[in-house]
Amino acid sequence: MFKAAMDASNETNPNYPKFAHLLSQGWMFGRKVDNSDQQYRFFRDNFPLLCGLVLLHTSLRRGVNLIAGNHKRTGFDFVFGXDIHLCSTRDEFLPYFDSLGYXIFPFLKYIKRNDVATXTYVDXTAILSLFLNDNYXSCTIWNRFYRSWISEVSFQDGMCFSISHCXRMLSYNLDYIEKRKSASEESNLELKNSSSSLSELDDRERLVAPIPLTDYNFVNYMAYITYAPLFIAGPIITFNDYIYQSDYKAMSSVKDYKRTFIYFLRFAFCILVMEFLLHFMYVVAVSKTKAWEGDTPFQLSMLGLFNLNIIWLKLLIPWRLFRLWSLIDGIDPPENMIRCMDNNFSTLAFWRAWHRSYNRWIIRYIYIPLGGGGKYRILNSLCVFSFVAIWHDIELKLLMWGWLVVIFIIPELAATAIFKNYQHEPWYRHVCALGAVINIWMMMLANLFGFCMGKDGTMSLIKTLFTTAVGLRFLFLSLGALFVGSQVMFELREAEKRRGVNVKC
């Protein structure tokens, strides 16, 4: 598999001149590096600056803790986060919308469907912010100096900041609305800062942590939406969870320094894997130039597969850096990628493991309010994946990707309903493996279409698979390989269950 991807993208391939201009000088064994992905290039080229920012933030935090002693963390987060917020994002209007939003939201409580009003206001704010930023972008004199350094480490564009802020603003205000609707003050915990008597809530319980109503204030609001370690790219943490960990009960996991060090080693290993892939197979450059003419179906499939793996890694690495930063800072956010993308056979489970914190946010604030998995499950899923597509970018291609994912979920839901009464039959596992093979192919095609090869590349792959002898041979061989691989994945999950681990994906 590695060799096929290398043969399709290295110097020996006849299509090499078409994408050679996208390659840069590398550092591994004298080879060039495929640094053509814009998002990851910004992260990779400015990695030392990001590390400097982590060191600066951590040093300031430790210094303030020594000087101020027992104080609320959110005060420091408010000051540091607000500076990063004002100086790093190219969306000049976003800070004003954040402040305006806080002033307007209290009045929404007088509206009968205040949750709908909140969502409508935040979505409209995000869209208006995008419009103003694109048409009236400016750069004030006072922050030009800061931007010359800080903006370099901010690899997301204005849209991503607006939609990310949309998610944070919704979390704060929907948590606030839920709190106002909840029972009397007697339901509150007797929370005291740094109280050792408090029991440690798990990650699900912290979503609805009984935070006092007085904690829903402007300082906490701004501290939350501009919390530096998670500001640039996440993972996403809810307002209740953030305040609970910041001001009431630090998780024991952030005090386990051995665990944090092992997490750092895993992060470093992921970077080395990514560097190896970028130096030895130039699949991103090939996909950008559509330089796959004459490649075999096997090579086309491997171009697509390793493209997806690089997309997975380019998201995993920043998320793990920012989560590592947050762990060092004393906040334990969710892990966004809890499985390798190649270790998935279920469409539903795949999305639980991919961008897990965002998946939880979607379920809590969108999917469940829409009705969840009831009789309108398919329609609710369509709404959710449409939102996810727009969250990535406003493109018809991504909307179609979201709708394809929903269509591909339907067979799995149907098969699960039909065969759920036969789980103890000896043939059940093999039927599941056949379904897994179909799922894997459908997930690959949907993601190749949306993020890698586009319409032309995906159609070219499908055409060669079904209209050529070599394509049909590869198709049937790959089906057999995926069938065996699915059995291995089943057994890996059974081994996890025997150890008491069940991550539901």
Swiss-Prot record:
The keyword Ion transport does not apply. One of its GO terms (molecular function) is O-acyltransferase activity. Its main location: membrane. The chain crosses the membrane at residues 218-238, 267-287, 297-317, 378-398, 399-419, 431-451, 465-485. Coiled coil: none annotated. GO terms for cellular component: endoplasmic reticulum membrane; mitochondrial membrane; plasma membrane. The keyword Protein biosynthesis does not apply. The active site is at H392. Residues 239-266, 318-377, 420-430, 486-505 are cytoplasmic. Keywords: Cell membrane, Endoplasmic reticulum, Membrane, Mitochondrion, Transmembrane, Transmembrane helix. It comes from the Eukaryota. GO terms for biological process: GPI anchor biosynthetic process. It is found in: Cell membrane; Endoplasmic reticulum membrane; Mitochondrion membrane. Residues 1-217, 288-296, 452-464 are extracellular. It is a multi-pass membrane protein. Belongs to the membrane-bound acyltransferase family. Membrane-bound O-acyltransferase involved in the remodeling of glycosylphosphatidylinositol (GPI) anchors. Acts only on GPI-anchored proteins, but not on free GPI lipids. Also involved in lipid metabolism, having profound effects on sphingolipid-sterol-ordered domains integrity and assembly. Involved in cell integrity and apoptosis. This is Membrane-bound O-acyltransferase GUP1. The gene is GUP1.
